[in-house]
Amino acid sequence: MDTRTAERPDTAPAPAAPPAGVVAVVAHRKKTFGGGLDELRSRLVGAGVGRLLWYEVPKSRKAPKRVRAALDSGAELVLVWGGDGMVQRCADALAGSGVPMGILPAGTANLFAVNLGIPVDLPEAVRIALHGRRRELDLGRINGEHFAVMAGAGFDGDLIRDADRQLKGRFGRIAYVWTGLRHVRGECVRTRIRVDGADWFDDEASCVLFGNVGTITGGIPAFDDARPDDGALEVGVSTASGAVDWARTLGRMAAGRSEESPFVRITRGRKISVRFDAPKTYELDGGARGKAKRLKVKVVPGALTVCCPDPAD
């Protein structure tokens, strides 16, 4: 099924503007980046930010409350310091507000930043956040919560659930590999998927993925055609079962040839519903959210404004 939508045409980037009058920083205090939060504060003050709101949180799940406080205080730009989990929580709170987000990638994988070309370089990330091109980007929404990079269930959800904070904190991306090896024998379950109102898949499956961007967990380029501004989500389902199947599948995915795998099917859509015969763990942007037998997923076009590198840079 061809569900590709017309992509919004690129427009000429706006000239660099002075920093917003009211800038809020929402920071995961346990994450490190460059010279740390002291350097960030110094750079923002030196850049001439008119009013600086500052919020630090010990866990990403506490970030939405701080984002809402920033919006209530008149924030014109929200800078997010942390990884994909922190970005997801803040994006969920900012969705539909029209207030831009600047990303300061201080996490383990920083996949949303990677897909947008935002470097792990504090001075440059700050420059992009203050003066970069502001793009209206899509978000996905699964069971009522927004995601920026991807969501998944089955093998993917189990992997994320077991790559717990302690393991991930100590070993970074290796944590995903380690836990992945523990789940390659994960069971397949009867899975029914409808895309934009039409039946698309009805068979045994081990994993279902929804992508807003191309590069997902583990740095794998799973969705070649994904763009975060095209009004659609990529939908992938895998029937791989066992170490040999998964080795072949992940090998193709790592090489950017997902659609060549005999164990993978991919399509695109705006609204997706999934039913499993047994509850499966699902995750979004690297954060596990428990088990469900039904998933309701949709794209929310232009939900989030993000400060991105200028193509001319």
Language model features by range: what are they?
Residues 187-189, 204-206, 229-233, 268-272:
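A generic structural signal for short beta-strands and their flanking turns/coil linkers
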Residues 1-78, 88, 124, 313:
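ATP/NTP phosphate-donor binding region
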Residues 85-90, 111:
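Short glycine/serine/threonine-rich phosphate/pyrophosphate-binding segments
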